[in-house]
Amino acid sequence: MYVNITNLGYKQGGSTITQQLAKLIFFNAEKSIIRKVRELFITFKLEALLDKEEILSLYLNRAYFGAGNYGIKSAANSYFNIDPYDLSIYESAILVSALKAPSRLNMMSSPILTKKRASLVLNKMLSLGLITKLEFEDQSFKLESFKL
């Protein structure tokens, strides 16, 4: 936001999950300073009313995952034919990897790039202590073995 204001225009993204949620719910994809300021006010309101889990849940239930899939339920069903609660760690990494650029980083349009990005997600999960080394190795093997 600072870069955008100091350059008097829209130069960079870098939105938080809450800002992305605000944009999904209230605004279109128009890139303007006015939209970003409005988005910022909505973001503050969302963060005051909801906890992080609620914000993440709302975001994942509305986000675009590529190949016509809006929301984690649609994506899990379309890509893996399962409910989101049944996703494995590597399947979750595949879906999360699509969020950066869903039209380009999804299993249908770019399976090799999707696997590379999902591998980065698994590495990040390991470095943050969200999964153990054993889980990382197991899920990385399953990811590499998975036919996209």
Please state what every model-predicted region is.
Residues G14:
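PIN/NYN-family metal-dependent endoribonuclease catalytic core
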